[in-house]
Amino acid sequence: MAGPGAPCDPCAPAAVWKRHIVRQLRHRDRTQKALFLELVPAYNHLLEKAELLAKFSEKLKSEPKDAISTRHEDWREEVSGTGPDQVSSPASLRVKWQQEKKGLQLVCGEMAYQVVKKSAALDTLQSQLEERQDRLEALQACVVQLQEARAQQSRQLEERQAENAAQREAYETLLQQAVHQEAALRRLQEEARDLLEQLVQRKARAAAERNLRNERRERANQALVSQELKKAAKRTVSISEIPNTLEDGTKEETVALAPAALPEFSESETCEKWKRPFRSASATSLTLSRCVDVVKGLLDFKKRRGHSVGGAPEQRYQSIPVCVSAQIPSQAQDVLDAHLSEVNAVCFGPNSSLLATGGADRLIHLWNVVGGRLEANQTLEGAGGSITSVDFDPSGSQVLAATYNQAAQLWKVGETQSKETLSGHKDKVTAAKFKLTRHQAVTGSRDRTVKEWDLGRAYCSRTINVLSYCNDVVCGDHIIISGHNDQKIRFWDSRGPHCIQVIPVQGRVTSLHLSYDQLHLLSCSRDNTLKVIDLRISNIRQVFRADGFKCSSDWTKAVFSPDRSYALAGSSNGDLYIWDVNTGKLETSLQGPHCTAVNAVAWCFSGNHVVSVDQGRKVVLWH
């Protein structure tokens, strides 16, 4: 049945019917659209939310999900309960829609709560995850750094291992070389020892042969002298008080002979001795001994002249000034800074016009004493160490010095370089002195030995072992005297192997000085005293002390005046002290330019000048 307004003629064209259907649809749309206009978009929106919530609900667990799904299914059953054949009214639909809306709102609220809760948990987990990622990144960076450090350490270890291997190879090579060199050194030492033994044996044989020849010559000389004395004893000789006068009133003819090795005596002294009255046999023995010396000198002189080649003139020593009475110095005439450092030694030559000083700067300066001034003469170089002692030979042509380089050295005046080195000591040489001949010398050292030297061959002819350091030595005719650190003075016979006498003193001995008549010995020691020893009775005769006098070091030197009337020494305060030997009292003390301790003093043979040296480079000439 056609609807209202439909065409009655079935043969009407199809377009008319189409228009009619469209009009009917539009009419139904206008009448029914208003009822579902709000429901359909809300439902579509709800479906979209449901799909979104379904995605979130998949992440949630059982109970909320089951409750929501159950409610949703119940709602669907309720909705589906109205069959397709049933037609609901708009009011019922609106009621259902509101109920469904409330249910959906409840579901949405629950879902929103779950979403918020899960979102908070998710944020917490994300923050923890970020923290762990940060820690992981830091640990990864630390791991990278450790790996780099490990790689660097591995490279360094490999380099060190390579260096150790190279050093081990070098060490093994050096060890092999050292073994070879030690073997070579032992061979060389054995060869040197053999050569030294051969040399010592050869020198010992030569010395024995020389001693034998000397003994034969001495015996021959003694035989000649005894024959001459026997001939002289057969004649009658009367001694008168007038010199050079015989019994018959005629004057004896005097022959002036001056052997090279005999000292000169002044005419006044000779006459004075001959004018003394003849009182005992001692005078006769003294006269006979002098006669023997004169005869021996004549024989030696003739023998030297006979063995000389081409008639060359015999070398003679210069005349030595004889001191009749020494003058006590009163003032400083000249002051010089002679050395670069401390001055340790000073010595006058035999003619009193030449002076030698030695110091720690390894130099020996020679000075001329002219007009109360010191004029530089020469500098002797080549010393191997600090100079501790200087000495002139009896002719004044050679200088002997002790040094800290375990040796003594010999210079010839006029030559700047050392002529000979006497080596053999094992420690510092503290003293070196000529004997009464220029061809022999004696040295003392801190190695507890005293050595005698043959200067002609630079050969040690004798070594004396002592129990203490030797600080100074002096020489007599046939005796050697040494002062030691153990407060003892020892006497050695140069013709025998053993010590013949020991004199103990208080304090370490710093210096010794023998008077020119060889009858008295002056010693200086660290107990701040000077002692005079009478060698005839081997006993201490006098002890000199003074307020303010203090021995400053183990090498402080003290000396006799040439006439043995005074004793002179320098103190640590720079003053010079002079004692009268006859009275034993302090004669005077000289205060002068010395600002430091005085190390050594020297009194010239003429007795006119005194020289002192100190630790502050100064050399002072006193008059």
From Swiss-Prot:
<dbReference type="GO" id="GO:0000045">
    <property type="term" value="P:autophagosome assembly"/>
</dbReference>
<feature type="repeat" description="WD 1">
    <location>
        <begin position="338"/>
        <end position="377"/>
    </location>
</feature>
<dbReference type="InterPro" id="IPR020472">
    <property type="entry name" value="G-protein_beta_WD-40_rep"/>
</dbReference>
<feature type="repeat" description="WD 7">
    <location>
        <begin position="593"/>
        <end position="623"/>
    </location>
</feature>
<feature type="compositionally biased region" description="Basic and acidic residues">
    <location>
        <begin position="64"/>
        <end position="79"/>
    </location>
</feature>
<dbReference type="Pfam" id="PF08614">
    <property type="entry name" value="ATG16"/>
</dbReference>
<dbReference type="Pfam" id="PF00400">
    <property type="entry name" value="WD40"/>
</dbReference>
<dbReference type="InterPro" id="IPR015943">
    <property type="entry name" value="WD40/YVTN_repeat-like_dom_sf"/>
</dbReference>
<keyword id="KW-0853">WD repeat</keyword>
<comment type="function">
    <text>May play a role in regulating epithelial homeostasis in an ATG16L1-dependent manner.</text>
</comment>
<feature type="repeat" description="WD 2">
    <location>
        <begin position="382"/>
        <end position="421"/>
    </location>
</feature>
<keyword id="KW-0813">Transport</keyword>
<dbReference type="InterPro" id="IPR019775">
    <property type="entry name" value="WD40_repeat_CS"/>
</dbReference>
<dbReference type="GO" id="GO:0016236">
    <property type="term" value="P:macroautophagy"/>
</dbReference>
<keyword id="KW-0175">Coiled coil</keyword>
<dbReference type="GO" id="GO:0034045">
    <property type="term" value="C:phagophore assembly site membrane"/>
</dbReference>
<dbReference type="GO" id="GO:0039689">
    <property type="term" value="P:negative stranded viral RNA replication"/>
</dbReference>
<feature type="coiled-coil region">
    <location>
        <begin position="116"/>
        <end position="229"/>
    </location>
</feature>
<feature type="repeat" description="WD 6">
    <location>
        <begin position="550"/>
        <end position="589"/>
    </location>
</feature>
<dbReference type="GO" id="GO:0005654">
    <property type="term" value="C:nucleoplasm"/>
</dbReference>
<comment type="similarity">
    <text>Belongs to the WD repeat ATG16 family.</text>
</comment>
<feature type="region of interest" description="Disordered">
    <location>
        <begin position="64"/>
        <end position="93"/>
    </location>
</feature>
<keyword id="KW-0653">Protein transport</keyword>
<dbReference type="InterPro" id="IPR036322">
    <property type="entry name" value="WD40_repeat_dom_sf"/>
</dbReference>
<protein>
    <recommendedName>
        <fullName>Protein Atg16l2</fullName>
    </recommendedName>
</protein>
<dbReference type="InterPro" id="IPR013923">
    <property type="entry name" value="Autophagy-rel_prot_16_dom"/>
</dbReference>
<comment type="subunit">
    <text>Homooligomer. Heterooligomer with ATG16L2. Interacts with ATG5. Self-oligomerizes to form a 800-kDa complex composed of ATG12-ATG5 and ATG16L2. Interacts with RAB33B.</text>
</comment>
<keyword id="KW-0963">Cytoplasm</keyword>
<feature type="repeat" description="WD 4">
    <location>
        <begin position="459"/>
        <end position="502"/>
    </location>
</feature>
<dbReference type="InterPro" id="IPR045160">
    <property type="entry name" value="ATG16"/>
</dbReference>
<dbReference type="GO" id="GO:0034274">
    <property type="term" value="C:Atg12-Atg5-Atg16 complex"/>
</dbReference>
<keyword id="KW-0677">Repeat</keyword>
<feature type="repeat" description="WD 5">
    <location>
        <begin position="504"/>
        <end position="543"/>
    </location>
</feature>
<feature type="repeat" description="WD 3">
    <location>
        <begin position="424"/>
        <end position="458"/>
    </location>
</feature>
<dbReference type="GO" id="GO:0015031">
    <property type="term" value="P:protein transport"/>
</dbReference>
<dbReference type="InterPro" id="IPR001680">
    <property type="entry name" value="WD40_rpt"/>
</dbReference>
<dbReference type="GO" id="GO:0005829">
    <property type="term" value="C:cytosol"/>
</dbReference>
